[in-house]
Amino acid sequence: MSRRSTAEKETAKSDPIYRNRLVNMLVNRILRHGKKSLAYRILYRAMKNIQQKTEKNPLSVLRQAIRGVTPNVTVKARRVGGSTYQVPIEIRSTQGKALAIRWSLGASRKRPPGRNMAFKLSYELMDAARENGNAIRKKEETHRMAEANRAFAHFR
């Protein structure tokens, strides 16, 4: 038995302008090669773009987009008796939020080239808030996979 106590989970810090943890989580996922100031610049430009296009609070649009992309279930490969099954598993809200952020950023990076990342990210978030876009499609695909493999749920 381990003698160490379990480490407490660190709560995500909030960003300097919006004072929001979700924004900070998004910045940390945009981050590449340790360039955090660039990641902040990309996100803040995207938020400004959202503000101009929708004339709504960009933070509420961001929250709505992430809430729309967050999955309830996911599938996990489980090997049973020589064959691999895709087993549907319910996921916690923090893990779902992390997946939603990852999918949103992946979808915005895959948008057609020619525009900067802030532009792509803002349009992906606005699409996700309106319940369409590639990140929403990814969530629906995951839910369909989980529904199709519901018979294997007892392999958990």
Curated annotation (Swiss-Prot):
Keyword terms: Chloroplast, Plastid, Ribonucleoprotein, Ribosomal protein, RNA-binding, rRNA-binding
Location relative to the cell: Plastid, Chloroplast
Example GO BP: translation
Disulfide feature: none
Single GO molecular function: structural constituent of ribosome
One of the record's GO cellular component terms: chloroplast
InterPro entries, sorted: Ribosomal_uS7 (IPR000235), Ribosomal_uS7_bac/org-type (IPR005717), Ribosomal_uS7_CS (IPR020606), Ribosomal_uS7_dom (IPR023798), Ribosomal_uS7_dom_sf (IPR036823)
Family statement: Belongs to the universal ribosomal protein uS7 family.
Oligomeric form and interacting partners: Part of the 30S ribosomal subunit.
Annotated function: One of the primary rRNA binding proteins, it binds directly to 16S rRNA where it nucleates assembly of the head domain of the 30S subunit.
Xref: HAMAP family: Ribosomal_uS7_B (MF_00480_B)
NCBIfam families, alphabetized: rpsG_bact (TIGR01029)
Protein name per UniProt: Small ribosomal subunit protein uS7c
Natural source organism: Zamia furfuracea (Cardboard cycad)
Gene designation per UniProt: rps7
